[in-house]
Amino acid sequence: MIKEIKQDGEARMQKTLEALESTFSKVRTGRAHPGMLSGVMVSYYGSDTPLNQVASVNVEDSRTLLVQPFDRTMVQAIDKAIREADLGLNPMTADVIRVPMPALTEETRRDMQKLARGEAENSRVSIRNIRRDMMNDIKELAKEKEISEDDEHRASDDIQKITDKYIETIDSRLSKKESDLMSV
């Protein structure tokens, strides 16, 4: 009973961590990486389609992404989608699309850092909410006399250790992201 509660809670915490990683991958650091364009939707025969389904996105060099459409007729639509995605990117179009990364100004770096801190805080809150749910489940079991008081305290300590581990992981990922952002 307790084991299932802990496993379920830890799985939810892991998903929160994965969501944070996904969000962090979209925050610009001045270096090119394909994940930056993962949220771009292209109008493909009347329906919005993720960019990675109509083109391959590769890193050409540390400051340039190379977008190669599977269908040559999609070049203009992909170019338009990247420009309208509000990422501050200005693609250059030929047979393939080159997306140079503009250098980040100090102000932009600070804004990106604030964004990263905000996302990390949201993840911490989410982890704490999961902990609260787990603790409530444990207290409910103790209230119904399905587990002993000792088991309740032991489970509470374990849940707190799991929570601390995930909060620490979030903090370390945030500090890594901040150092990436502030390195020129």
Curated annotation (Swiss-Prot):
One of its GO terms (molecular function) is ribosomal large subunit binding. It is found in: Cytoplasm. GO terms for biological process: cytoplasmic translational termination. It comes from the Bacteria. InterPro entries: Ribosome_recyc_fac, Ribosome_recyc_fac_dom, RRF_sf. One of its GO terms (cellular component) is cytosol. Keywords: Cytoplasm, Protein biosynthesis. Responsible for the release of ribosomes from messenger RNA at the termination of protein biosynthesis. May increase the efficiency of translation by recycling ribosomes from one round of translation to another. Belongs to the RRF family. This is Ribosome-recycling factor. It comes from Psychrobacter arcticus (strain DSM 17307 / VKM B-2377 / 273-4). The lineage of its organism: Bacteria, Pseudomonadati, Pseudomonadota, Gammaproteobacteria, Moraxellales.
